[in-house]
Amino acid sequence: MKRLVLVAGGTGGHIFPAIGLGQCLSSQMPDLEVSYVSGSRPLELEIYGNAGIEPVFLPCEGSPLGTGGVRAVTRWIQVLRSVRAMTRFFGETKPDACVLFGGYVSFPALVAGRIKQVRILVHEQNAVAGKVTRLAARLGIVPLTGWEACEPLSKGQFEEIGVPVRPMKRLPRREAWNKLGLGGLPDGKICLVLGGSLGSSALAGKVAEISRLPEFTGWSFLVMGKEMGDNHPSDGVWGIPRRWDMGPLYSLADVAVARGGASTLSELRAWAIPALVVPWPESREDHQAANARLFEKCGCGLVWDEKRGSEGEFVARLIQLGKKSDAENDSSVDPGIAADRTSQVFLGKILRTLEGGDGNWMD
């Protein structure tokens, strides 16, 4: 029995790739024991619980960096306790390898891994490296990345492998719609609006505005996020409660409007759904904009700047993507192929990391 630990917390952008990798590897390697490690935020508990996973929860709820006063002191204490808990966990389970998926929860695992001499891999989903990724690179760990760029690291300091995506099955259109419980299936184009795991009232508001324009006659907009609730605020616009089973929504989407989180963009790419990406302007070091530029560069969609772009540009680009979906008709694309491909590459990197030890996991 081989043991692999996947460390991911914070938001769905870190957690979903870990779940995607773990599920793919577990289905292919029955003798592989996969454990998950998370922080203690309610959102993290919700995401893992929905996937039927019981992770090891570290006693921390966020990074002490960027905070001050009592909150910063409290979080530093949580970090120290988490390092101790992670060190104890590594000592008890003796994993063959550990993969860090970034976010605040990865720092205690990185420190504990150095203490217990656990082989560590780091995956960076975004086109801008996070603090743990940069620290790992300075320690001689070559980050595995989701994109062809990982600022400020230069070529040769990282290796692009893609972002693991959750294995999901494409459903027939009517079956997918019925799972949402929204009544009769509408005719015309369906646009999926994704604000990330934290939701986005700004995107919901923008869609509500443009949905009334004559250019979008016959379109239906499915707006997912906690702000909308389960409602039908106007003709052609449905609010979908936050959900983690995305298969029905991806199966319905002809086009999407989305924030620039790497996990979301990778899943849209795997499903061949053209997307208008609206990067969240407050993202760390503007990493969502960097993700969006590379998403556009690979021909998967277009970018609209929320602060500087006009409504006319938003409308024109969304219409352009709607025409792209008509021309390419990618409804037969199997998203499971992309999930399997990235996981196989990842497995190869894990095995390479174990060279020199008992690294033959395939016996």
Identify the residue ranges that each predicted region occupies.
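Acidic donor-binding loop of glycosyltransferase active sites
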Residues: 95-97, 251-266, 273-274
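Donor-nucleotide binding loops and adjacent catalytic segments primarily
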Residues: 37, 42-45, 51, 173-256, ...
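Glycosyltransferases and closely related glycan-assembly transferases
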Residues: 26, 84-98, 106-121, 134-138
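C-terminal alpha-helical cap of glycosyltransferases
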Residues: 317-323, 336-363
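Active-site-proximal region of nucleotide-activated glycan assembly enzymes
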Residues: 35, 54, 114-174, 182
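C-terminal "capping" alpha-helix adjacent to the active site of nucleotide-linked donor transferases
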Residues: 298-299, 303-305, 309-326
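Short hydrophobic beta-strand element within catalytic cores of glycosyltransferases
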Residues: 258, 274-285
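Conserved nucleotide-sugar phosphate-binding/catalytic loop shared by glycosyltransferases and other
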Residues: 3-9, 31-81, 161-163, 305-307
